[in-house]
Swiss-Prot record:
May have a role in S.equisimilis virulence. Keywords: Endonuclease, Hydrolase, Nuclease, Signal, Virulence. This is Deoxyribonuclease. It comes from Streptococcus dysgalactiae subsp. equisimilis (Streptococcus equisimilis). Residues 299-327 are annotated as: Disordered.
Amino acid sequence: MSKKLRNFLVRIIVAAFASFAVMAIPPYHHNTVLAKTVSVNQTYGEYKDYYTVIGESNIDQSAFPKIYKTTERVYKGQGTSEKRVTVSDVVYNPLDGYKRSTGAYGVVTKDMIDMSKGYREKWETNPEPSGWFRFYNRADNEEISEKEYDSRRTKSYKVTNNVPVVLTTLKGKKYNSHLFVASHLFADSLGGKSIRKNAITGTQMQNVGTRKGGMQYIEKKVLSHITKNPDVYVFYSAIPEYQGAELLARSVLVSALSSDGVINETVRVFNTADGFNINYEKGGLLTESPVSEIDNIEDSTTDEIENSVDDSEEIVYNDTTTEEEEN
């Protein structure tokens, strides 16, 4: 069998597996670090901080990258610092047949945290995760997939799903913003990269919850424990959970196991926002917004992505959307 034919068959198999839906949340196990399926019938209302602890990590340490010593310059691939650092490589699984991120995992060390402190890596070119855009033919405005868009960019266009909404701070102040951010799977504060394979289209609430919720619950727990105990390292993985062929993850399964055993848990972080009806199938919100003008085309949302992430720690959500938002 030729290499070309073999690669073609592999792509078909990957896409086929991605299309199957499981109608109930599967029991958690950590034999593989891959995207998982999750039920569309979940009830999230009881999880006001957008996460729940579901058990121990069940992490197989032998499946994780090894810790090693190198220089900061070599590890970061830039700069001139020859400082010796103890690190691990972070593994970013490839996008699946629907161009969705499928997981990231690695071992977090004190040096990885220190190198990330006070520094935000710029996002790679075209980092927007699945569900961020919708794609259309220019000739007839027929909706197409991202793969089809990639194959004929001069004859198609894309429209952002991330429409403006009204959000509310913990102090009750309302302001205009966007509901979605490019949410890191492996947190940049823990050494994760700002690349598409390490991001999902997540709500601001999924990203930070309230002051203690969302992805920040487990991220801050790991960061704090390592900062206080510099010799400790943490096995860490984040796996998005999709329903069938939906482009937006319903949740993210995050597991953490510290070398001293103090941290040993798996949390499910919900990609939801009370008061908003999210379109998980295609991205955006479930409101009527037919495509009528190509003037709405948005070729880059990098600023939106960069400015939305850690600056929103105090953001909570509206209990209801306004009439203006619905229209």
